[in-house]
């Protein structure tokens, strides 16, 4: 597995975001937590503050093999409202790249007509 980006939004479920990053790093996967905010700071669904590695605009998605969308109701809403996240999801689908979505996040793929049914 090459490079993985986990999208981080305010209101995301901390365990769904950070556990993915932790497990992949333990498996020696190059994984990056990318904030969709203008800053690295994230405030999770349970009021836990943590920092991303980079912001969304710092990522060259041509070099990324997989994206991960964590759940959390507010986090899902923030990811869905971010035009860049939606565009990357659509681009990954067209390029047959990996997309993982947890909990409430698959609805982002449905809203963008990536999933049907």
Whereabouts are the PLM-identified features?
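Extended, subdomain-level signal for the structured scaffold at the beginning of enzyme domains
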Residues: 1-95, 108-117
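Short, thiol/selenol-centered motifs that function as redox-active sites or metal-ligating centers
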Residues: 102-103
